[in-house]
């Protein structure tokens, strides 16, 4: 009966250990942490170092995946920007072409044509940025996440972890055999103890070799992870910075060209209307108070002090007149109305 109880107790212990091992295998991270000293202090330090390296490489791998996901999202958004930008560019160019007959007078058609042509450069910058993300960020990080050096190093650490668990279990077995020899030092118990101790020595030797190999492999992978990920992160930041700078420069040029066209239209003299016999024009004399340089053939050069015969005044602030035998347009703000010429000598200059 006692032998049966001991056998049942031993069976329960074995089942409990197996259940614990299964739970650890499926609930753990791949490398099991433990504060139990299996062999000595040196092995304990290596175990803690491997645990730290395993967690560090796993964290770096997850961070690399996060960067890859972000870069993939940037690329997808960029493709949508290109699609929307291409459609807008086509719409702007079409509107400008449909209203090209009077494009100099239609500032909206002119602005649409300017933006439609320049928008192609914006889309080209987006394409270049997407290519940079693929070659400088996505491809290198994907290769490292799925690379064999990382997996090989982690497998070594996992093998060491399993071997350490085996050694921890076997150390308990050695202690049990030692206690049994003390209780009954018969040859059979002594032989079993010697076998258990020999196996323990073999486990210690194998752990020493495997521990060094796993530590070196994980340390090398950790260093490579940090170095490569830092380089790819810097490349992504630099590429995004340059992308936004070039986009800003293109948009600044577009804006400046639009504003210039608007200012030119607002400051340009009005078109000369077709006159008919029934139209009456009021003439008056004016003196130039500010010099004016003509910017086109329709405009008139003026020097301060000149006298001019004003023939037409438009609602845009421009006037048409004649001075020194030449006719053209000029800003009304540059002249003042006079009742008569100061001397007869000036009359010849006017006409």
From Swiss-Prot:
Detected in all tissues except seedlings. It comes from Arabidopsis thaliana (Mouse-ear cress). PANTHER family: SH3 DOMAIN-CONTAINING, SH3 DOMAIN-CONTAINING PROTEIN 3. May be involved in the recruitment of DRP2A to the accessory protein complex and in the negative regulation of its GTPase activity. Transmembrane segments: none annotated. Residues 1-21, 193-213 form a coiled coil. Pfam families: SH3_9. This is SH3 domain-containing protein 3. GO terms for cellular component: clathrin-coated vesicle; cytosol. Interacts with FREE1. Interacts (via SH3 domain) with DRP2A/ADL6. Binds to SH3P2. InterPro entries: AH/BAR_dom_sf, Endophilin_SH3RF, SH3-like_dom_sf, SH3_domain. SUPFAM superfamilies: BAR/IMD domain-like (SSF103657), SH3-domain (SSF50044).
């Amino acid at each position: 009966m006692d032998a049966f109880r001991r056998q049942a107790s031993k069976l329960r212990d074995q089942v409990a250990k197996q259940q614990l091992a299964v739970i650890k295998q499926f609930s753990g991270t791949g490398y099991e942490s433990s504060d139990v000293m299996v062999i000595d202090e040196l092995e304990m330090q290596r175990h803690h170092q491997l645990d730290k390296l395993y967690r560090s490489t796993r964290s770096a791998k997850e961070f690399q995946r996060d960067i890859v996901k972000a870069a993939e999202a940037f690329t997808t958004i960029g493709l949508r920007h290109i699609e929307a930008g291409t459609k807008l560019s086509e719409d702007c160019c079409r509107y400008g072409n449909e209203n090209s007959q009077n494009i100099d007078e239609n500032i909206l058609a002119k602005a649409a044509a300017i933006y439609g042509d320049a928008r192609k450069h914006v889309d080209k910058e987006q394409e270049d940025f997407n290519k940079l993300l693929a070659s400088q960020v996505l491809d290198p990080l994907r290769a490292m996440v799925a690379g064999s050096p990382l997996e090989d190093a982690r497998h070594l650490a996992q093998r060491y972890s399993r071997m350490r668990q085996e050694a921890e279990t076997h150390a308990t077995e050695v202690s049990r055999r030692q206690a049994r020899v003390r209780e009954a030092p018969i040859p059979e118990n002594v032989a079993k103890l010697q076998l258990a101790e020999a196996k323990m020595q073999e486990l210690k030797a194998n752990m020493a070799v495997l521990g060094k190999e796993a530590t070196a492999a994980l340390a090398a992978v950790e260093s490579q992870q940090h170095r490569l990920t830092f380089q790819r992160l810097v490349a992504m930041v630099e590429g995004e910075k340059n992308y936004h700078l070039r986009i800003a420069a293109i948009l600044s040029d577009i804006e400046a060209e639009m504003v210039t066209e608007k200012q030119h239209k607002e400051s340009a003299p009005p078109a000369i209307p077709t006159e008919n016999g029934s139209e009456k024009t009021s003439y008056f004399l004016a003196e130039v108070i500010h010099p004016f340089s003509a910017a086109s053939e329709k405009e008139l050069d003026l020097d301060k002090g000149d006298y001019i015969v004003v023939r037409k005044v438009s609602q845009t602030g421009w006037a048409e007149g004649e001075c020194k035998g030449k006719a053209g347009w000029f800003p009304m703000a540059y002249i003042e109305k006079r009742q008569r010429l100061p001397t007869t000598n000036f009359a010849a200059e006017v006409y």
